[in-house]
Regions:
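Peripheral terminal and inter-domain segments
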Residues: 371, 472-578
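Long, low-complexity segments enriched in small/aliphatic residues
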Residues: 307, 314-353
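Structural motif
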Residues: 269-287, 295-299, 328-336
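Bacterial N-terminal signal peptides
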Residues: 1-8
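Generic recognition of flexible, low-complexity loop/linker segments
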Residues: 328-330, 385-390, 414-416, 484-486, ...
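Gly/Pro-rich cap/lid or specificity-loop segments adjacent to the active site
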Residues: 12-285, 340-479
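Intrinsic disorder and flexible/low-complexity segments
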Residues: 302, 325-326, 371
Length: 578
């Protein structure tokens, strides 16, 4: 039975806004029913004529009897990532908040299920060397533009236009005010919404904060350099890590010097076959691989070991991480939407001399800016409102969260934004990267967000638990890339359905063409490559393995290079089937 949700009487338009009808739906990985639908908006909001596009909307309803009128909204990063894909994880992480509040998720125009601007820039599939080529390969981008322009005006997918879409959806659902959580680029989107619709925001959380004048990718080189030095310094302060790598800074210099002389050979697991494959690794891609690792607090704990191996001539771990990062971009992001945003809001405003200065002497260098500028020369440039790059000063209670060693959005960025927000608090998570995975005590951050939204104010918010967050021990053992053969009986005993122990994930382990695959309900499918009788690599996800507990019938997924710390535990859902 469809659910009709009345439109808000406080809508900005004089005419009553359309009523958005949502229907009960199943979301993979989500326990219980959600409510789903689509909402049409004008592609050209200014002229209100021509093409209309559909936005994907998911509401995860509140579970308790005492319901608050203002939902919790998530705006994802990228730019280009889907927000609705995060429904299961958000419902699990913020279960206490969901007791009283709906979780509202809308895929921003150009992403996910909202007229996605996807570009297949690293094809053909299985071409590993192609996937390890330019970050913005120009011919595929030119072809993607030609394909998308058949039914899209690529100049109309900027942040300001998209945030007016979100407000229209809010009104159509009958919500008066929102509690917004923005992550990474989503913090820019949140600030834009706060500027354009301040009376509609009850609270805002900015996680991995992007200042309005950040000009992506201008600050990638110095940000990554700062993060790398910080992580290596923490290794030097840990007894075991320092003992294993006493000359780590010197070894790091050797790696970048060697790569600066030309590409090196490395070996990666082919995500299609699971077989080791030789590839050529450039300095740019090696730097990108290390930068990807620094994004993750857990993977950053592997950086010293990976650089040490590379200094000894083994570049396989770096190549694996560069490849998995590229595959993740293809799987989760909309390259066309990324270009439509950054080619209007960022790249045109970068001074080439400033880009050269900020990149000088960093391990990243200027390759990203040079390639992104060339890509934007091929992409239509949208317009931005006057004053778009100016700081936002909305009087909205705002909690800003940064990781100490975030390579993309360092704490300084949050301080810069908070300076103009009269009701704000900025906190820095020790040891944290762009994501806070793998840190001990990190549930403190989630609890602070929940308390803040429930109170609607920063008054009395105690942040002392932040100081108790710790990094797990650095990985000091080398990564070995090896694949073994398994018998039919060995493969068969692992088949079946699994549930995450205490979490939202659902998975199916299946056999296809004699190989095992794990299919996550919400996260996609991965080939499993056996490295031991009960131990499998998730091909294309760097540093992750599945460890089967055959006696207990459970499966544990652990990151290969963080001393076996579990990140996911699966338990059988049903009896094993052949």
């Amino acid at each position: 039975v469809a659910l009709g949700v009345a439109a808000s009487s406080l809508a900005r338009s004089a005419a009553a806004p359309p009523t958005l009808t949502l229907s009960p739906c199943d979301v993979p990985g989500l326990e219980g029913k959600a409510r789903c639908g689509t909402y049409e908006v004008w592609e050209n909001r200014e002229t209100r004529s021509g093409r209309r596009i559909s936005l994907k909307v998911v509401v995860v309803p509140a579970t308790g009897p005492d319901r608050a009128p203002d939902p919790f909204v998530f705006l994802n990063g990228g730019p280009g990532e889907s927000s609705t894909d995060g429904a299961p994880d958000l419902a699990h992480e913020f279960a206490k908040l969901r007791d009283r509040r709906d979780i509202l998720l809308v895929d921003q125009r150009g992403t996910g299920g909202s007229h996605p601007l996807n570009c297949e820039i690293f094809l053909p599939p299985g071409d590993l060397q192609g996937a390890l080529g330019a970050f913005f390969p120009l011919e595929p981008i030119r072809q993607c533009r030609g394909r998308l322009e058949k039914d899209t005006d690529l100049k109309l997918y900027t942040t300001s236009i998209a945030m007016d879409d979100i407000d229209e959806v809010r009104a159509a659902l009958g919500y008066d005010r929102l509690n917004i959580l923005g992550g990474s680029y989503g913090t820019r989107a949140t600030q834009v919404y706060m500027r354009r619709h301040p009376e509609r925001v009850r609270t805002a959380i900015l996680y991995g904060v992007v200042p309005m004048d950040d000009k992506m990718p201008l600050h990638i080189p110095p940000g990554a350099e700062r993060a790398l030095k910080g992580v290596l310094a923490e290794c030097a302060q840990e007894a075991a890590c320092h003992a294993a790598f006493p000359k780590l800074e010197e070894e790091s210099n050797v790696v970048w010097s060697t790569l600066g002389k030309g590409p090196v050979r490395a070996r990666v697991l082919n995500p299609k076959t699971g077989e080791p494959t030789d590839v050529s690794l450039s300095r740019d891609l090696a730097a990108e691989g290390v930068r990807y690792m620094l994004y993750s607090s857990s993977a950053a704990g592997e950086v010293p070991a990976v650089l040490h191996q590379a200094a000894l001539g083994d570049y396989t771990p770096i190549a694996e991480r560069a490849l998995s990062g590229r595959l993740q971009i293809v799987a989760t992001g909309s390259t066309g939407m990324y270009l439509s945003v950054t080619c209007a809001e960022d790249v045109p405003w970068i001074d080439p001399k400033e880009a050269e200065r900020l990149a000088a002497g960093t391990f990243i260098g200027d390759y990203r800016y040079v390639q992104q500028r060339a890509a934007c020369a091929l992409w239509p440039k949208g317009s931005i409102p006057k004053g778009f790059l100016e700081p936002v000063d909305a009087p909205v209670p705002t909690l800003l969260i940064s990781g100490m060693w975030d390579p993309a959005t360092p704490p300084f960025d949050a301080e810069q934004v908070a300076r103009y927000l009269p009701k704000s608090l900025s906190i820095v998570v020790p040891h944290g990267g762009h994501s806070l995975d793998g840190l001990e005590g990190v549930e403190c951050v989630t609890n602070l967000q929940i308390q803040f939204v429930e109170r609607g104010s920063l008054e009395g918010l105690s942040t002392g638990c932040i100081d108790q967050i710790r990094r797990r021990p650095f990985r000091v053992e080398p990564l070995e890339l090896k694949v073994i053969a398994l018998s039919e009986a060995d493969v068969t005993k692992f088949l079946g359905s699994y549930l995450e122990d205490g979490g939202p994930s659902q998975a199916e382990i299946v056999r296809r063409d004699g190989k095992l695959h794990i299919q996550f309900a919400a996260e996609g499918e991965y080939l499993l490559a056996p490295v031991a009788p009960t131990r499998f690599r998730l091909v294309g996800v760097s540093g992750l393995v599945l460890v089967f507990d055959v006696e207990g019938g459970a499966v544990r997924a652990a990151r290969l290079l963080d001393s076996g710390s579990p990140v996911l535990k699966l338990v059988p859902k049903a009896p094993k089937a052949n």
